Amino acid sequence: MTKLIIISAPSGTGKSTVIERLLTDRELNLHFSISATSRAPRGEEQNGREYYFLSPEEFRRRIEANEFVEYEEVYRDKYYGTLKSEVERILKEEKNVIFDVDVVGAQSIKKYYGDRALAIFILPPSIEELRSRLQKRGTDSMETIKQRVDKAEKEIGYAHLFDLRFVNDDLVTCVEQIRKAIAQFIAK
């Protein structure tokens, strides 16, 4: 039976890199679940590659039609969510689904799929290390970094709700630990 792998973590913990590396492991047979959003595409983004881009009206219509496993309005008329049809498409291909979602979305997906889903939370070694990583990126203002760190502290408060937790203090080690945990879960 195909399984669902939910990955959640604060910004700056290496979640995207961990997921990219896991996707290259053929034995895990993972396929990335593309989220839907009502925000406009940025730069080179294409519909169906980075996101499914929907108008706010279309997003709300699909919410009313119960077409989402989970969704959230992060700002006024700026929605993000996971379409049931996207998950079903991947499962029909006999692949395991991997999600990159926030803590609220992770809990919704876990509740919907139950024991068929494994919820993993990636923690930074410390809040100080997280702040340092975000500063080294050089992409955010100090105010944005403060907001991300504040949000991370709140998200870490949800870590106990996840099936497994891993600290990313060494990327290679963290990826290998998560890979082993996923392989064991898939083999059940």
Curated annotation (Swiss-Prot):
Keyword field: ATP-binding, Cytoplasm, Kinase, Nucleotide-binding, Transferase
Any GO molecular function: ATP binding
EC number(s) given by UniProt: 2.7.4.8
Keyword RNA-binding attributed: no
Tagged with keyword Disulfide bond: no
Pfam entry (one): Guanylate_kin
Positions of the Guanylate kinase-like domain: 2-183
GO cellular component assignments: cytosol
UniProt: ATP binding residues: A9, P10, S11, G12, T13, G14, K15, S16
Residue intervals passing through the bilayer: none
Class in the EC hierarchy, top level: transferase
Catalysis performed (reactions): GMP + ATP = GDP + ADP
Subcellular location: Cytoplasm
Family membership noted in the UniProt record: Belongs to the guanylate kinase family.
Alphabetized PANTHER family for the sequence: GUANYLATE KINASE (PTHR23117:SF13), GUANYLATE KINASE-RELATED (PTHR23117)
Protein role: Essential for recycling GMP and indirectly, cGMP.
Protein name: Guanylate kinase
Annotated source species: Porphyromonas gingivalis (strain ATCC BAA-308 / W83)
Upper classification of the organism: Bacteria, Pseudomonadati, Bacteroidota, Bacteroidia, Bacteroidales
